[in-house]
Regions:
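Charge-rich, solvent-exposed alpha-helical interaction surfaces
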Residues: 26, 61, 65, 87-90, ...
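Short, small-residue-biased leader/transition segments that mark boundaries at the very start
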Residues: 1-8
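Signature of dsDNA virion morphogenesis modules
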Residues: 6, 17-23, 116, 126
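Short, cationic/aromatic linear interface patches
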Residues: 104-153
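Extended alpha-helical interaction segments
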Residues: 10-77
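Surface-exposed polar/charged interaction patches
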Residues: 72, 76, 94, 113, ...
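Intrinsically disordered, low-complexity, charge-dense segments enriched in Lys/Arg
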Residues: 12-13, 136-182
Length: 182
């Protein structure tokens, strides 16, 4: 990535710390209240964050979401730092295309129990398989938004055609005149 685009990204999202503050776990609720915007908005993807900030900073941001989840779930057995770090790296690498807003939405849905529950232990495998389910949900949502957009475009075209077209009875009148003049 070019130096100019790096500068732009940093201006837009600030340094790693201000990005982390802006996209903190409390924003999960906002993402859940604005599902369409979470998917279609212009929040940066994990890949873009990786181009803009050192990997450690991106991992730290994901770890903050995970720690928030552990705190929410009230887990008895706290995971080791190594486990949390490894999980954050797996999420960053495997789901590089997810936007920050989508990941926040995922953690919100995870907390609501939509992808199963945690019994005293937050199993990394449960989180990874929940991400697979979320990926399918994301695909359905994006397809739905795409269909809705195509429908809007079609309606616009029809409205435009209607404005530019001659009403049907006038066509018949015109045709009648042509027929009579022959």
């Amino acid at each position: 990535s070019s130096a100019a685009s790096d500068v732009y990204k940093r201006q837009r999202y600030g340094d790693g710390e201000s990005f982390a503050k802006k996209f903190n776990p409390s924003l999960q609720v906002v993402c859940a209240q604005n599902v369409e915007r979470s998917f279609k908005g212009n929040a940066p993807s994990l890949a873009l964050l990786g181009e803009t900030y050192p990997d450690e900073q991106v991992n730290t941001w994901i770890i903050a979401q995970l720690m928030d989840l552990y705190k929410f779930a009230g887990v008895k057995e706290k995971p080791t730092f190594q486990q949390v770090l490894e999980l954050s790296v797996m999420i960053r690498v495997e789901y590089y295309y997810l936007k920050a807003s989508e990941l926040l939405l995922f953690f919100f849905k995870l907390k609501t129990g939509e992808y199963g529950t945690f019994y005293g232990v937050v199993d990394p495998m449960v989180i990874m398989s929940a991400l697979i389910e979320f990926k399918a949900y994301r695909k359905r949502q994006l397809e739905k938004y795409d269909r809705e957009e195509q429908e809007r475009q079609r309606e616009k075209r029809y409205e435009k055609q209607d404005k530019n077209s001659v009403p049907f009875p006038d066509h018949l009148e015109f045709l009648k005149k042509i027929m009579e003049s022959e």
